[in-house]
């Protein structure tokens, strides 16, 4: 039995167990139907009482699902199918339900969300974009409110709206919250920058269902969510670095490996840089900023492609989501890469800002007590789901048989051949009136196909990053007779394509893929656009040896075949390669690409573990201070630790003749500007007591002035120190990762190098927090303004 078949054998066993619960739910159908609205609504109070009295969610699961099912029918006019109930049970168990496009994932989620919200700890559904979150909260929210639960929406249709803490607290205190993954991530980071209880709003992360789980939990897992703060000193090296890199010759001055997306300066390039800048030693410590900027410029030119990784819009670089081609509004690449791309495109170079806080989706979602996912394509990545999130992937049977035909790929030697063949095929299908969804792998390619269709006189809609606002509407209309829609991969996920009148008779929706994507899951998602709910349709992919997939992950023999045959073909007379070995080649290359993606995501987890441990430590200490609890940064403990450490330093490293100078310097830098005479004859114990006396006098004076506000002052002093040190640490760790990754070429383990340096930096950060808190407590000036508000001036 193959691994693929064994997965589905395992699914049968899982579904057999779920069938027993389904039978119980179905047996309650008539009973629920006889209840009045008031009696059905009263079930929510009953369930909550039963949970308080010791029953578990599993104990009330069948009855709760039956209640929601009946509520769905009364409120929405929709009664969940058996397969949707099974999907809901999978979600309640904290697993991923693989449900085909059009099978009703939105309705499926109502049952597990209601059940898990009954505990009063919150339940969330996280969608792919704000439009879907608002739409689903509005529609499904009617059911929850009917049953007495509150519903919050974590996003707004007004992108300019800046919600305050009170508004967000109201949202997150709701029984059920609809939001997006990115909104949740940024809210989490902002909440942990709060300096008082009144500014905090985020509850403990309890239960969440992630829509399009494979795209968010896997494909976007390496993308960090970053909150940027104060800018660095503006660099003038981007322009000069860009000028030099433009003069470099590939594989002579620098090495570029497209397959592994690696680029670095070779020895010849180093010599050119030394000659250009008139410096004797390129890698000397004093040249580190120059080296950094040259590497950034090299990355900007070779690793980031306009129309694929970003677009230029109104003089700004806007990043594209690799999974769907959408613009990532408000997102910038960190570490200077964004500025290097701006210089490459001859735009105004924006200030390079420091990262104040960051988190990856992986670490964000692993904080939930229970996590579930919905997707149309997750089965092939079940191993990774289990390893990273401890989530099984259960394939849910379709309510109606799938009637879509998936044709074998049409394979061509060159890109021009493939493009010509694709356009000719579109013409043939369009002549029949059958609607077409033509999917390109990048914004650049979608625009190219759009131009060629215009030249061919074929009217169509172009759906890519430039027109994301109309995305749902355009996708929804893509099934009308004669419609041709050109889209980027994954665009419109979450919106069904419904067939127009008479389209079934024409053969349903035709999905035409213009290249194999880097992951098999993406191709399956594209195919799944056609054939929803038993509709007829077909999918056909056109591929070539010049596609990104083959260039980046193809075997050497395939590259040799291309070089040998590329000049033998006529683009206007494309010839498809029919041999089985070529079909097998593209399948195996995609599997290799999937493996590389999984490996890269695994390395992200390894890298991010240091940041995660430090983040947890810092946030825990911040929350302890805000809540008035004692932590490692209790001001009283810090004074004792800092003074004791200084005395130990005097005892071990300072000569006797320098003793007075060191003590005075310590007092002046950390405690007071009023220096008093210190006798050379004082012992270290006497010096220690003397320093404690100074600290006690300063704090007593501030305590007398502040009275009941003294505790607020202590917390503020410590929080400010923590935040300053943590911002520096986050920024440093981001830079460190870039450096550590580069060390891989020097036969060093980049993860080991990173963790080693990160641990050193972590200890330095903790020491700096203690010392800065000490300074904040003693050197700060405090007073009350004319309104009676506490004012603190930190030196």
UniProtKB/Swiss-Prot annotation:
**Broadest EC class?**
translocase
User: Topology relative to the membrane, per the entry?
Assistant: Peripheral membrane protein
Q: Which UniProt keywords apply?
A: ATP-binding, Cell membrane, Cytoplasm, Membrane, Nucleotide-binding, Protein transport, Translocase, Translocation, Transport
Q: Name one GO cellular component term.
A: cell envelope Sec protein transport complex
Catalytic activities: ATP + H2O + cellular proteinSide 1 = ADP + phosphate + cellular proteinSide 2
Q: Report the InterPro entries cross-referenced here.
A: Helicase_ATP-bd, Helicase_C-like, P-loop_NTPase, SecA, SecA2, SecA_CS, SecA_DEAD, SecA_motor_DEAD
Q: Which domain of life is it from?
A: Bacteria
Q: Which GO terms describe its biological process?
A: intracellular protein transmembrane transport; protein import; protein targeting; protein transport by the Sec complex
Query: What Pfam families would the database entry show?
Result: P-loop_SecA, SecA_DEAD, SecA_PP_bind, SecA_SW
What Gene3D superfamilies does this protein's entry cite? Answer: Helical scaffold and wing domains of SecA (1.10.3060.10), P-loop containing nucleotide triphosphate hydrolases (3.40.50.300), SecA, preprotein cross-linking domain (3.90.1440.10)
Q: Which SUPFAM superfamilies match?
A: Helical scaffold and wing domains of SecA, P-loop containing nucleoside triphosphate hydrolases, Pre-protein crosslinking domain of SecA
Coarse class of the protein's main subcellular location: membrane
The family line of this record is: Belongs to the SecA family.
This molecule's function is given as: Part of the Sec protein translocase complex. Interacts with the SecYEG preprotein conducting channel. Has a central role in coupling the hydrolysis of ATP to the transfer of proteins into and across the cell membrane, serving as an ATP-driven molecular motor driving the stepwise translocation of polypeptide chains across the membrane.
Q: What is this protein called?
A: Protein translocase subunit SecA 2
User: What is the organism of origin for this protein?
Assistant: Streptococcus agalactiae serotype Ia (strain ATCC 27591 / A909 / CDC SS700)
What are the leading ranks of the lineage? Bacteria, Bacillati, Bacillota, Bacilli, Lactobacillales
